Amino acid sequence: MFVGTLVIIICTTLIIIIKKILKRKKEKLNLKESKKKKQDNERKNFEGLLTKKRVEVGDLKKEIEKLNKDKIELAKKLNCYIGDSSIPANGIREYDIIIDIPSVDYLSQSRKSWIIYVSNQLKQKMGSSNYNKKRPLHSLLKEYKKFSTLACLGVLNKGKTFFINKYNGTYLPSGTQAQTIGLSLSISSLNETITIDTAGSNTALQVCEDKTEEHLARKESTEMFICDMSFSLASIIVYVLNELTWNDQRFILALQSKIQSLRSESNIIKKLLVVHNYPKVNSQEELLSEIKTYIESPFNGNFHHHHVDIKKIESKEEIVLFFVESVNKTHHFFLCNDNSEFGKRYNQLTIEKIRTYKNYNDNLDLDKVLLTSLQNNMIPYCKSPKKLKITEHEPTINQINNNNSSNNKSQLEERPIADSLFQTQSFLHPSIDDTIQDNDKSGSEVSTPTISSSSSSPLQPIIKDEKDDNIENKSDEANTSLKYKPLFTSFGTDEYSKHLKELCKLHQMVSPHRSSIKQIPAFTISPEIDCNRENDFKLIANRIEIIGLNMVFSSGFKPFHDIVKVNSDLRYIIEVPQLEMEDIEFETKHLGSQWYLNIKGIKKLRYDSNDQTTVYPSNLTSLCPSQNQRRDGLFEFSLPIPTEYLPIKPAVSLDKGVITFKFEKIG
């Protein structure tokens, strides 16, 4: 009995233990399955999330590609290239030679010179055995047996550099954020051409404290001088413009007249090409509309439209349109939106046609031509420019220190920028941020800022406390606690201070567009004889006359004259003090339906009374600067001759500095 009970108890205990063991195993199995299920769910969720992220990454990549394409297309529309994505690895991105000309009278300053920058490729040639220090530029370009010179002229931001890039296949910086400096030369072995790019006219004048007239005259003279230099150095002149304006027409007329004079007087042949750049034209219909608007009508009265033909040139089964003026053979070409399908194809064909115009210069001595052109073209703008020389550049101590401290520093910050000639002033007061911070801390009432008459900018907040007129006697600590009053009624005091503070911080962060020079300074242009610089290279046209709304720059000596009728004679009485007959040239010309008396000459000043042959200061004399120096230099003007007077062989007499031309009445 006892044994049976014991067996039952043992069996029951074993059953309970087995059940517990099975239950635990089941729980473990369930837990394992639960973990596995959870892991499977997590894996599925992760795979789903990964797939979603991959889709998002793919979409982002597509968006980035689209943005890059838009960026490149936008850059092309702006005629400039942004970043490296649109420029081939072997693409030419810099000029070969840059002649930096801050101002035409820059050499009037002691120890100043124009700097010639060259690319790394040309710089390496300076150490070769063929390099000649006496003819440095000729040595660097000696490998080019023959080449044509092309100058690109035009107003600022009209597409000059864009044209050069298309012409040479280069990627030079262009557009509103890049400005060409001085005379920038690009050498193309493909076209056998040296192209000359310029900064363009109508650029803004920097702020100046005093002598505003002199700064304006200097700006005008420098732009004209650089334009004259480009014209004299080139055999092919390309004038780039957008929609034709009256200023463009006048400039084209001046170029045509100058080219015709050189051809007839000196047998110098130059070719003028006018390139009309239309960045908004996307089709041939739009181009023909532009031609009818800006070519046919404006040139109708001036260039005899019935003699002008639209020529058709077959090139690669495509047609290129261009105008040829029958009177002076000036060719007009057209460029369209390079981003459009039509413009891209049409521009390429137009450039191919323009490349066919060549005027080669064999064995051109660039050093001699450059120096001669510089001196001759300075004559209308400077008092008595002397001979110039080209020497190797010797960096100053400051430039060496700057190069050692920062190799990536822009050359523009190291080069002199017309030191005392052009001066800029700050946009905001240097302590404005500190003042605003003090206002935020004080939280008190803000007073109205008043702008001082000596302020360099209308936005420069020179603040004056209304409660104390004698602000100048306060300490610096008191001045830093000056208060602002809102200038805009829509802002509260705190909102205005916060807004102005953010504006000032943003102003400090942004940088203006700069034209940095990455090339290496290699040579300098300076006077051969370094004496009397201030007088020899002094600016002539430093006075301005306002006629209506136009500024007229007076340059050099301008003779006064009277027109007098005596009985049946007509007399032109002209004051020419200190001049002899051999100093004056005159002739009568028939232009259109009118006869003119054309008079030109040069007036030279004499300073040494003991030696009448001394034209400029001798070793015994020195010229002291004065505000009202006597006028000298070249002069030329024309006077109309009425039809009732005989226009040829006038009687001429010179007495006591007055020259008289007498014309007899016909009949």
Swiss-Prot record:
It is a multi-pass membrane protein. GO terms for cellular component: membrane. InterPro entries: A-crystallin/Hsp20_dom. The keyword Ribosomal protein does not apply. Belongs to the small heat shock protein (HSP20) family. This is Heat shock protein DDB_G0283913. PROSITE patterns: SHSP. Residues 551-667 form the sHSP domain. Residues 463-477 have a biased composition (Basic and acidic residues). Residues 444-457 have a biased composition (Low complexity). Its main location: membrane. It is found in: Membrane. The keyword Protease does not apply. It comes from Dictyostelium discoideum. The chain crosses the membrane at residues 2-22, 224-244. Residues 18-82 form a coiled coil.
